[in-house]
Amino acid sequence: DIIKSLYEKGKYGKDVEVICNGFKTDDYLAKISDLINSGFQNIIPILDNYRELDKLTESIDSTFNIGIRIASEEEPKFEFYTSRLGIGYKDIIPYYSQKIAEHPNARLKMLHFFINTGIKDTAYYWNELYKCLRVYARLKKIAPEVDSLNIGGGFPIKTSLNFDYDYQYMVNEIVSQIKKFCEEEGVEEPNIYTEFGSFTVGESGGHLYKIISQKRQNDREKWNMIDSSFMTTLPDTWAISRHFIMLPLNRWEDTYERVFLGGLTCDSDDYYNSEQHTNAIYLPVFSDTKPLYIGFFHTGAY
């Protein structure tokens, strides 16, 4: 609906490139088919499972492009071994040979590679990238029309003032590894697409709060109460222990004290503290007569 609406407003033509990710309901598949049947030829639905191609075949009456999402292996610390999304590494080549190679209309154009932990300079990440490249090289040799690799998972965003991540190094290293692997395999390098959701929009948002009271529960713990709830306005802080840049907005020259931050709800999890995160929280000393405001930054992703 958004694609159609923007087209009708003249924002782009029917040559716009659209990648359709995720598990697709019948309604989602029907709307993808409608776009392709109405002349949008650069729509690429990324197959999450075998059923999706069958449904698209039933409803599209012309040639169309598709991609396949690789079901990557998760980090050892995860509660499951393989991503719930996509098709397994070992199943992609047989699936292509049996269902796509002789398909009258579908053309495989893209492999989608997504790592939940994001792009990190770790053995786990490089190992998963190499497995993806092996699939790409094998596919390219039997399916020349495959020409694109969509890298998901994305770059991290700055979550603390001492954040240190060498973006340029990682970009250069990823491109270098892809180029080197393709040269060794004797296949053409793919067009590289990226999906960096948090990195793209993370810095677009911030949350501002007022400290409305301080509670001393014992000799060591001081609770600064905000005029809102972390559970409702910043749910990532308690749900997945997300850390954000947090700074006082005023009284920077005052004396500081170590505190815990609590939300207004009666839920015991409605807090943001130094035990849960990497840095202790220090704020200007609470005063009933001097208002204190704080801000959480780079919260625009979710």
Specify the residue positions occupied by each region the protein language model found.
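Charged (often Lys/Glu-rich) extended helix/loop segments that serve as interaction or gating elements
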Residues: 173-175, 179-183, 187-302
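Short glycine/threonine-rich loop-to-helix capping motif typified by GTGT followed
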Residues: 120-127, 158-170, 201-213
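Conserved, mostly hydrophobic/aromatic
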Residues: 1, 68, 111, 151, ...
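A compositional/structural signature marking long, glycine- and acidic/polar-rich segments
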Residues: 133-141, 148-154, 162-176, 191
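Anionic group-transfer/hydrolysis microenvironments
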Residues: 50, 71-73, 114, 152, ...
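Active-site-proximal beta-alpha core segment in soluble small-molecule metabolic enzymes
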Residues: 1-148
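Glycine-rich nucleotide phosphate-binding loop and flanking beta-alpha elements
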Residues: 26, 53, 74, 157, ...
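Glycine-rich beta-strand-to-loop/alpha-helix junction loops that act as flexible
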Residues: 115-116, 149-159, 194-199
